[in-house]
């Protein structure tokens, strides 16, 4: 087994029992692939598929004019280069986007010609607005902030059949309904009412009988009945009435008359129920007709019009009920044969027949007019309007699109469903197999008449009791719309608006000699795109607290948003976990609160297929043997198979062991024999999301707590010094690398140069392209603000001379440690109560933890100030501010902007700004005098940017933006100069590195080669030596050497060209950078100048901060205790944190206890390794100890592949504690934890004996730090990875004396954002009244509230040392008096 450069440094001991079959896929693939498919930048113009932008253009173009003589055709589109790169866009507050240009062709036809003839073609590029580009990490920069487009889980287009579960009608009767949902266009609903009549609705409007729709489609009554019913023929004669015998219809019926065979024997007596045996006897007897009583005809419906063959008179119409009068009429007219509809109560209902009777429309046109009146009430139905509306509803590609998915879902649900034998022989089978044979193949993306009829027929068949309704929460009926598809829809809607405008102008195209760019105005397109990215419900401000929150946000799927559900209407079923979520959507990670179950996270291995359905990988099983083949199955496909779990036992050849295996089939858990198994899960963690799979021992936690654990990891604040978790799950590396927080090598090579800002790697010769200079430069991100104000800072993880492979770690980022996610710190924890300080989940923590800066985090705040052009004159950013103290002025430079590095506190001026005030406009003379004598103070007010209350920190950066045409101040100029200087240095360094690398390559390439001549009179045929090359005046003279080997000579020439190109590129880049910096900035209208100040704030851990473990065990720090008072062990080491043991049993998150035990073992092993290293033991002894650690149980590690130096480096990285991986559902067993504890704390070690372990080595004796006495019982002590969450007391709490108040109530505003106060309301007053605390109450209502005089006196009294209160009248009473007076009641308060 080969280890990468980073893995060698710290191998994580895994307890996994099963080998890794499938690597964790790239976690951001859903987002990145979806947008790449939308843009199709990689594909040549003619190779672009009908997706994304291409599909949007194709669906709108060609645009034809109203008269048909001009049309606009789309040729292809191109995307330009973005003007600014990502960091520049973030700094300037603009969108990272590229200009979109489409090549459009205007074709004008000859009006005079008899057949369509092209008269003229004009073609040019048309600017279509800007399209935001995705950053490499899957986010977008919109107006300077990083945003994420969340994928949407919506109902798939297609046809769905359901019932109301008996909730609509009081009788509990099931009312069936069907709905055809297109991708865009009108919804078509069919529904039964309690009387079993069938209705339809369009777009949830008024319902109408479904037969109106069928008539509008061109069917008459007879054809409608012919489609939906089997027939019965009755023969009328003087001897009575007979009917054709259909054996299948007799079963379960009661014989109305004796059924006799040809000899007259009774086969079934009158009044007896006909059984299956009776039917066999009747069939064997060869009977073809049965006698029936004439009365049984009454109430039956005629299948067709009955016409007198002689007179042509219509005796009865189709669907007429047979009455005695009708029978008499038949008798008179000599009718010998009548055909009726075959209807029975059981499985052939009279629904369509009854609906037809309620429908009074006659014929196709009347039906269409009725539909028009329902859709457009109040508008006159002209024939043309009626036809146009009806065709546009479902049959026009412009207004209706079922989509590829919708067509697939529709066909599988109607035409391609499996029919039972009875259905095959009924009207339904004939309809699908004969009448509509081939309809599925020719189905386009609009509805056909067959589609509508097939939907109605399937619904009627459902009501007849055949088939099952659909489960709308099944993931086969819900699909994912990712960022590419959502953007495409917005782009198409913008183009559709353009189309309407263009059609109007196309008629004038020829006469006015217009070009395509004159016709097309791209404003609607860019407006649609801007609106979507800026304010759509699915475009969200990226959660950037730590790398995990970034990854999770990009992998989120939401059922909310346009075209989705709303919180209020979503019921329990939609939110619930469904069996089809298995391996696709995480059953654990979802928000608590109103969005629970509506916002989900993709499982680790889930991906979307071409149709947008989620699929998950499975290993194929053939005849009980698990193969290496992996198939991705969607929820629809999965229902057809028997799937074993990932933890099923296998023998060495991969055969399933045991008589029965636990499997899943159609959403149920079953026990199946190995030969029935068709697939097997690929990994135990396949079910859960990334956040949930980071929780070790997840299988021992209650689901509710696991949910909290998964959610709270996303709120962990990056610590100053990240520390890898001792107990992890093995997926930490994937998250750190895929989030792009940690930098990995693009190509293998040797590290040439490292400093805090950049790492330079000289690429291996075999990975460098021939003739190209092989150098990779990694610029690191330093102290940058994230969306949540946390600090993003990358630190190099390599040193010069290190040899890297592709994919090796180059630099660590926020919350990563040696390329692994490190959200918190490993804390020594004791579970015991301590003087009530850990009551109700409070956390007692050692002062040492705070002093060592273990949980110190850096937060970066951005403060802005703008100088506007006001009516009274321009605002000015200046140092000259009226009444500013000397101390504050000293921090500002001559331009009035704070220095970098200044320590600032609340209220300090950061940027001095004055605004003109006064009513009058100044005359030019006055302006001149003011300018000469500088009388600024009188007519300006101080509107400087000050440090907000409750905030203090260090200024780390200042950026000044100035509008074009306005002179820059000195500070702005110096910022530009230093930026350019730094950039030039960077470029020079890069060139130097490229040069050195190139000449090193040349030297390796040409030394020892023969030359035909060269500088310094190099003789022909002589060999080139290192000394000769060193003796040349300049290395650039090497290019003048003429080599005999032509291939090498060509390579030398290529390198020369490449270096020249690099120099030119560097100069060009410098000029571009200079232009960007020196040209004016685009600012909002009216803004002359903008200054951004970045302040770094150090937040130490303090009481009131929220902390949590990974198992949902959260709490608030109640006290930071001096280290000497903390409980300590026998060897004098104090614990870091004391937690309440009562927080474990009721919460059922036992995973934290197992983590603590395994962490305790990890720490003990680290201490043993540390001791061995200090004693300078030999590498062999270390190797033996590490072998016991890594190869005792679980996954085996190949330590023999490491050299002695690498073993020593590995051991020194484990000094603080070993690294364990306990994968989800495949973690460490109790016996393995005990094994590790025994390895860490061997019983024969005197140090171990001193600690006073119990037998299982999970508890030790602790001593009270205050008294030095041992506690009565042994205490569970161990190591847990504990996090500090983003809910910091510094950001929650504030103090206020006076401040803003509400005009209406005259009371202070509420909340920190408004600098509000605390409201002592009605109920609080009642509480004090109930206690009889009269003086406290008086104090609360007067001197602590709005009794202004009382407050002043109280201050004076305290200063004098008199502790007394002089309470007066609170302002609230005056407000009350004023309000009563406003009612016209004069009221005065008398003072006593």
Swiss-Prot record:
InterPro entries in the record: DNA-dir_RNA_pol_bsu_ext_1_sf, DNA-dir_RNA_pol_bsu_external_1, DNA-dir_RNA_pol_su2, DNA-dir_RNAP_su2_dom, DNA-dir_RNAP_su2_hyb_sf, RNA_pol_bsu_bac, RNA_pol_bsu_CS, RNA_pol_bsu_protrusion
PROSITE patterns in the cross-refs: RNA_POL_BETA (PS01166)
Keywords from the named record: DNA-directed RNA polymerase, Nucleotidyltransferase, Transcription, Transferase
Catalytic activity: RNA(n) + a ribonucleoside 5'-triphosphate = RNA(n+1) + diphosphate
GO MF annotations, alphabetized: DNA binding; DNA-directed RNA polymerase activity; ribonucleoside binding
Domain of life: Bacteria
Keyword check for GTP-binding: no
Enzyme Commission (EC) number: 2.7.7.6
Pfam families named among the record's database cross-references: RNA_pol_Rpb2_1, RNA_pol_Rpb2_2, RNA_pol_Rpb2_3, RNA_pol_Rpb2_45, RNA_pol_Rpb2_6, RNA_pol_Rpb2_7
Any one GO BP annotation for this protein: DNA-templated transcription
Quaternary structure and interacting proteins, as annotated: The RNAP catalytic core consists of 2 alpha, 1 beta, 1 beta' and 1 omega subunit. When a sigma factor is associated with the core the holoenzyme is formed, which can initiate transcription.
UniProt function note: DNA-dependent RNA polymerase catalyzes the transcription of DNA into RNA using the four ribonucleoside triphosphates as substrates.
PANTHER family: DNA-DIRECTED RNA POLYMERASE I SUBUNIT 2 (PTHR20856)
Protein name per its UniProtKB record: DNA-directed RNA polymerase subunit beta
Organism: Neisseria meningitidis serogroup A / serotype 4A (strain DSM 15465 / Z2491)
Gene: rpoB
